[in-house]
Amino acid sequence: MSHSSTALLHPYVAARATEKFAPIYFFCHPLQSAETDVAERANKRPIWIMGHMVNANYQIDEFVNLGANSIETDVSFDSSANPEYTYHGVPCDCRGWCKKWEYFNNFLKALRKATTPGDSKYHEKLVLVVFDLKTGSLYDNQAYDAGKKLAKNLLQHYWNNGNNGGRAYIVLSIPNLAHYKLITGFKETLKTEGHPELMEKVGYDFSGNDNIDQVANAYKKAGVTGHVWQSDGITNCLLRGLDRVRKAVANRDSSNGYINKVYYWTVDKRQSTKNALDAGVDGIMPNYPDVIADVPNESAYKAKFRIASYDDNPWETFKN
């Protein structure tokens, strides 16, 4: 039957024949729209809003509900290099929550629930966790042990011994370049315990605002060749320029740089957030995510930035 032959049919039959093909016509549009969305998404830098000092279990829900898609948690160690508490202590940021705390392993269990699909406490948008490792209390020669013990704790209480544990990406943030062996201890322990594949979920950061070349040398000693986040910042009580951020961004965007992502802390003002985005950062770390979380959606920024999801690999350098 030719296309024109519907005109010869009874009006009801002709209408039904037209309806039969109508869904095909309308079905094309969502596909085109989806392709456009994917293309637009690929051209926007994914941004991680990293809630600062999330150290009590209830704060996980609180910060995600305020707009964070990632959190930073402080980890203190006992004299034997065991991770003991999630605790920052004083001094800390102006208007920050310095004294919230939890036993480290209890926090890991709560974090696992918050990042395990199907759990009643699951938050789909919580995709990255930075552990700010307070290794200043340790001797340099304890760094390897600290990494070893940290890995064992995470393996048991967060990754559930490799059996459907939490899915978030983890950044080990170390304040002292001399403690690079923490990375070695962590990596070798996961291998010894039979779960080297979990290193695919682990990245690194040296948070001491050291010279970029010195940081590169520490990674070389640790055998790290990827998964690198570079932090820069200062307490929100003080002002800090973006000079080092720009150096880190230049390293990230160069053909031979070692950095994959750059984040800036601690940012609680919208203008500071805009300045950091203008400088090209991948992450912003606020005490109050709700104050700044929608900045990437402002008209001046939404064509270039979007909030990162689990589909965004935090170890891949964004290329535009």
From Swiss-Prot:
Subcellular location(s): the record lists: Secreted
**Listed cofactors:** Mg(2+)
Q: Which residues form the propeptide?
A: 16-41
Q: Where is the signal peptide?
A: 1-15
Q: What is its main location?
A: secreted
Which GO molecular function annotations are given, in alphabetical order?
A: lyase activity; metal ion binding; phosphoric diester hydrolase activity; toxin activity
UniProt-listed Gene3D superfamilies: Phosphatidylinositol (PI) phosphodiesterase
Q: InterPro entries under this entry?
A: PLC-like_Pdiesterase_TIM-brl
Q: Establish whether keyword Transcription is in the entry.
A: no
Q: What does this protein do?
A: Dermonecrotic toxins cleave the phosphodiester linkage between the phosphate and headgroup of certain phospholipids (sphingolipid and lysolipid substrates), forming an alcohol (often choline) and a cyclic phosphate. This toxin acts on sphingomyelin (SM). It may also act on ceramide phosphoethanolamine (CPE), lysophosphatidylcholine (LPC) and lysophosphatidylethanolamine (LPE), but not on lysophosphatidylserine (LPS), and lysophosphatidylglycerol (LPG). It acts by transphosphatidylation, releasing exclusively cyclic phosphate products as second products.
What is the name of this protein? Dermonecrotic toxin LarSicTox-alphaIB2a
- Source organism of the structure: Loxosceles arizonica
